[in-house]
Amino acid sequence: DGIAIGADGARLYYCPLASRRLYSVATDALVDRALDEAAVAATVRDEGDKGGAGDGLESDAQGNVYATNYEHNAVLRRRVDTVGAWETVVSDPRLLWPDTLSVAADGYLYITANQLHRQADYRQGQDERVKPYTLFRTRIDARPVLLR
């Protein structure tokens, strides 16, 4: 869900569940056992507002970061060349609570929509999810992050 490695492996992006904020932490600090919690925390950056609530994150080899946005049935992209600006990659009423993202070698971004808001816990005991669940894809002409 809300975790993605940067294209060069130097930053790990994350967001709290259903958060509107994006954060990153230095990966070198995460693997350095000599650092205490405060030293690791000192490498955390607030990357700003994600343009909406959601917790699915992904990144591509070009350095772009993708985030789900359940409020607008959408996936957003923070382009590496626009210094933090977010744009809509896809918005579709069928993307009911987009959740997990994956950039694939075929140039597509794959998206699951889990219909979380339709679960019985949120609908007075009535499960309103529609099955079978759907895996969506949209062409982004990007490649996945490959670190080794």
Where are these regions (language model features)?
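Beta-propeller domains
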Residues: 1-29
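Beta-rich, blade/repeat-based domains predominating
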Residues: 1-11, 46-64, 93-106
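Conserved beta-strand positions in repeat-built beta-propeller and related beta-rich domains
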Residues: 6-7, 12-17, 59-60, 65-70, ...
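Beta-propeller domains with acidic blade repeats across secreted/periplasmic ectodomains
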Residues: 71, 85-96, 102-103, 114-116, ...
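A short beta-strand motif characteristic of beta-propeller blades
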Residues: 39-49, 86-90
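Structural signal for beta-propeller blades
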Residues: 20-22, 73-75, 118-119, 135
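Short loop/turn segments immediately following beta-strands, especially the blade-tip
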Residues: 24-37, 79-82, 140-144
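Blade-level signature of beta-propeller repeat domains, shared across WD40, Kelch, NHL, RCC1
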Residues: 102-148
